[in-house]
């Protein structure tokens, strides 16, 4: 019973880390979106903390896939006039958007992993 309680506590602490990771990504983007390189630098620091915590080659793949696919989707949407960004560097999107999409992908992947560990499946 004590083992289960300790494991449950660990999983909830992991979920808390994931939420802090996502909230920091959002707050840094809101605060520094006009200072593109500062935003990129701070978001990369958050990304590195996430990757160090999760330590998985799959997380790196998820980040790269999310960064590329998410940003590509935004470029297509901008190209068709769906929306625009207040600042843009390449193809209508700011450089920090790559990191934001990658962080979002890692966050959703890790939340799915934690929910699976807690028994929320099928």
Question: In which residue ranges do the predicted regions lie?
Answer:
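Aromatic-rich, lipid-facing transmembrane alpha helices and their immediate juxtamembrane interface loops
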Residues: 2-122
């Amino acid at each position: 019973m004590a083992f289960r309680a300790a494991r449950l506590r660990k999983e909830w602490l992991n979920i808390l880390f994931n939420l802090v990771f996502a909230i920091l990504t959002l707050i840094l983007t809101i605060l520094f979106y006009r200072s593109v390189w500062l935003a990129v630098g701070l978001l990369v620091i958050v990304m590195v903390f996430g990757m160090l915590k999760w330590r998985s080659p799959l997380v790196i793949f998820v980040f790269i896939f999310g960064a590329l696919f998410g940003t590509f989707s935004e470029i297509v949407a901008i190209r068709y006039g769906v929306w625009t960004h207040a600042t843009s560097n390449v193809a209508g999107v700011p450089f920090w958007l790559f990191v934001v999409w990658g962080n979002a992908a890692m966050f959703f992947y890790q939340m799915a992993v934690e929910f699976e560990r807690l028994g929320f499946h099928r």
